[in-house]
Amino acid sequence: ALPVFCTVLPGIASPQGEIAQKSLDLFKTGCELGAYFGARGVLDNGPLVPYEFPADMPIHRHYSPDVLRNVRLPQRLSWKVYWDNLLSRMDTACKFAADYGLNYYMHPCVGSLTDTTNGYLLLKEELGWENLKFNFDTSNLYYMHENLSLGLLKLGKDLDYIHISDSYGQR
């Protein structure tokens, strides 16, 4: 069996509804595939901040600080509207995962809203889904200046999946 099935769908966090819906549809397919392969969960990067990326830029699993320095937020972005829509989409994603008996793991990475345990815990508190979990990626969290010991303590029962890596948080 596959321990975790990885989906990388930053469009779930898109402020553009049609992009987000397409990503949610793909996420549901990812849940179906994960369950088929016997995974205990699906993993995605945490919701990406709604930056405006160049249209011809490919999707990356990790965005470098150099890339993020050269993008900006949409001029007319309303944080409240964006946050409410994001919570609705994340709620749907958690439900899809639960429907397939899967945990939904948030992967911390530069540029996401869950790049630290605090970001994840805020999202978890807002959503309340028991199957929403955090991928404790030691390298990425170290890169984000997370106190690893404190992060482990804060996660408590949400500590379910640890990725021990040595990539300086950049791969």
Spans of features found by a protein language model:
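Short amphipathic alpha-helices and their capping/turn segments at secondary-structure boundaries
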Residues: 1, 27-40, 147-157
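Gly/Pro-rich active-site loop or hairpin
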Residues: 113, 117-121, 140-171
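Residue-level signal for the start and early helices of compact helical domains
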Residues: 3, 74, 127, 150-153
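Active-site acidic/histidine proton-transfer and metal-coordination neighborhood
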Residues: 13-134
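Membrane-targeting and insertion segments and their boundary/processing signals
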Residues: 4, 8, 94-97
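Hydrophobic residues within beta-strands of alpha/beta enzymes
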Residues: 3-5, 42-43, 162
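Active-site beta-loop-alpha junctions enriched in small/polar residues
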Residues: 5-10, 47-49, 107-111, 137-143, ...
